[in-house]
Amino acid sequence: EPVRVAIVGAGYMGRGIAHQFLKPLTGMRLVAVSNRTITEAERAYTDAGLESVKYCETLGQLEETINSGDAAVTEDWANICCSEQVDVVLEATGEVEFAAHVAMKAIEHGKHVVLMNAELDATVGPILKTYADKAGVVITNTDGDEPGVAMNLVRFDKTIGYDPVCAGNINGKIDHYRTPDTQRAFAEKYNQKPIMITSFADGTKLSMETTVLANATGFGVGQTGMFGLECDHVKETLNFFTPEHFANGGIVDYTIGAEPHTGAFVIGYNEDPMNQQYMDYFKMGEGPLYCFYTPYHLPHLQITTTVARAALFGDATATPLGKPTCDVMTKAKRT
C-alpha cells in the first residue's frame, strides 16, 4: 500500500511539494491538502493538472473521499490529523503557534510528522520530539532543506569513520538590513511573499535552520551569531577553521558568497596517517579536517525521501537529540 500523505499549508512550498507527489511517484500518494483559504488548497492540485477536487467539510467526508481515491481539500486541518486514511502529516505553513497545534494533534493520533517549517522546529522542536517519542511516531525536518541536507552528510561522515565537527549552510549573501520593501520585486517575480523573502535575505531563516541543525547534532556555536565565513568556495572554510575551534565540541556555521552558493557542508576530522595520504591524493586536502558538501538543496523534490524514511523505517532525517543546544535571538533593525 502506498504511504498516504496529507499537506497542511498550500503556500509556495506546499504547492511545490504537492506537484511532486501528484506526478508518477512510486509508493506514495497525496491524499489531502488543507489550507485556511480553500482556493489555495485546490490550486495545489490544479497547478499539477488535476481538475477534479472534492471539498470535505467533515471527517467522514474526508475519509470517504480518500478511500475512493479522489483528491481531497479541506479547511479543517484537525480532520487531516485525525483521519485513519493518513499516514504522514506534512506541515508547511511557516507559522509557529498554529503549526505546533497541527503537530501535536497529528502526534496524538499516531501520525508521523514531517516539518517543512524551520521556524517551528527551532522554537519547540525538542518539546515536540518528546511527545513524538512517547507516541511512537517520527517527527522530523526534511531532506532538501539545509538541516536535512547537512544531516545526510553528517551520517555519511560517521559511516566512513570521520568525526563531524562543523556543519552548516552554504549561503549566497546576507544583508541584515533587508526589508519587505527592498525584497518586494524579487518576491513578486517568484510569486512569494515579501516578508518571507526578507527572512531569507536578512539571516532570519538561516538562524532558524542552523538552530534546527544544532539541535539535531548536539552542536553549539563558535560565537554568538556564528562566524559567517566570507570566501570564494566552501572548501576554503578549511583555511579558517583549525581543530582548536572544536576543542569544546562541534559547531554550526555558514558561508557567505562561497561557491556553489547553495546547499550544505560538513567538516569532518580524521587524523589517521594512511587516510590522510589517500585523501590528499584524491584532492581533499592534507587533513586532519576535510570539507564535504552538497551543492544543492531541493526541498520540494527531496522531501519524498524523508517521508519514506519516516513511514517505512521509523527514522528521522533531522530531529532533536534531546534538550536544545542552540536558540535564536532577535535584534531590531531600527530604533
Give residue ranges: language-model regions.
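Generic secondary-structure signature for well-ordered alpha-helical cores
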Residues: 22-26, 46, 50, 130-138, ...
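Rossmann-fold NAD(P)-binding glycine/threonine-rich loop
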Residues: 93-109, 116-137, 142-144
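Hydrophobic beta-strand scaffold residues
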Residues: 30, 73, 113, 138-139, ...
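C-terminal catalytic/substrate-binding lobe primarily of soluble NAD(P)-dependent oxidoreductases
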Residues: 1, 186-335
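Rossmann-like NAD(P)H-binding beta-loop-alpha module
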Residues: 132-136, 140-201, 205
